[in-house]
Amino acid sequence: MKTYRISPAGRRTALILLIGALIIWAFALWTFRTTLDISYNPIEFWSTLRQKIDAGLSIGQIVPALLMLVLIVATPLVVWNILEEWAAAYTPEEDGLRFTSLGLELTYPWAGISAIRRVDEDSDEPVDEVVFKEDYTRQIRNPILRFLHGQAYGRTKLPLYAGLANRDELLDEIRQRAGLGEQPIGIEPEAAGDLSNA
């Protein structure tokens, strides 16, 4: 059984994205602190924040602080997505497509795959999604990992990244084993049916 992983070029791209996300997160933490003039010392954080709120905040403080708070919360989720892509491995097996990454191990039965669709046709490096008939994330016992994986991909989809080595070979094998036929790459299943009727 062959396992498909992100190529070295894909890993370099993921590393650049990861560094960028960490820089954004550090900037958001610094800007949030300086905008509200609070301390990040665990003992003083809540008391200094409460003092600033009780003293009253101006619009010039509230708007940037809220934007930075959104970045502080959202950026770690983006970092998880990038790390999960970095460690992603796809293995076609007899009973289905096995996906592993960062402690996750999911097996998607071949009969549970309903389609493969291209996410962005116009991209230089397109990403395809494997669409499932139902939610298989219940195989993940850890609720935190289940949430993180679900927010990264959705519960009924699994991306096949542009940086995946031998991606077209994997796509062909998935189509063959799942009985999806010779659906042209990049065409929605409905559109592929329309082409065959033309």
Predicted regions and their residues:
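Acidic, Ser/Thr-rich low-complexity segments on the non-lumenal side of membrane proteins
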Residues: 100-138
